[in-house]
């Protein structure tokens, strides 16, 4: 099983507002940059989209070390998801889960891809080269969204 390190980030100018996502993937023999943007979106949606697009770009099951600077994504996947599903996509306060469309896509992708994922939190804007690279790509995605107006 190939080992892949992934760094993801989301950015938003206004929340909601134009946003972008970026992902930097690296393995022993290759690197890949992914980015995109949307107009009326939120930072959390862009953080999630970055993870979805990065995992979807992998063509076969991999051992993934996934670095995110979003506690929302990290805790959603490692702490909250099972409870949300058990409650029919409701929070502990019985409210609908926000961004349920993306949570369901991410859950489906993780559970059917065959990837083994080690979720890791990295402090954003703190000099981590992989995170800084993903941040640059996310900002490129914002620029792309703004050009599409």
Curated annotation (Swiss-Prot):
Recorded catalytic activity of this chain's protein: Endonucleolytic cleavage to 5'-phosphomonoester
CDD domains to which the protein is assigned, alphabetical: RNase_HI_prokaryote_like
Keyword Metal-binding annotated: yes
Ligand binding (Mg(2+) 2): 9, 135
Nuclease recorded as keyword: yes
Residues involved in Mg(2+) 1 binding: 9, 47, 69
Gene Ontology molecular function: magnesium ion binding; nucleic acid binding; RNA-DNA hybrid ribonuclease activity
Domain RNase H type-1: 1-143
Single GO cellular component term: cytoplasm
Subcellular localization(s) per the UniProt record: Cytoplasm
Entry keyword set: Cytoplasm, Endonuclease, Hydrolase, Magnesium, Metal-binding, Nuclease
HAMAP family named among the record's database cross-references: RNase_H (MF_00042)
Protein name from the UniProt record: Ribonuclease H
Taxonomic lineage of the native organism: Bacteria, Pseudomonadati, Pseudomonadota, Betaproteobacteria, Burkholderiales
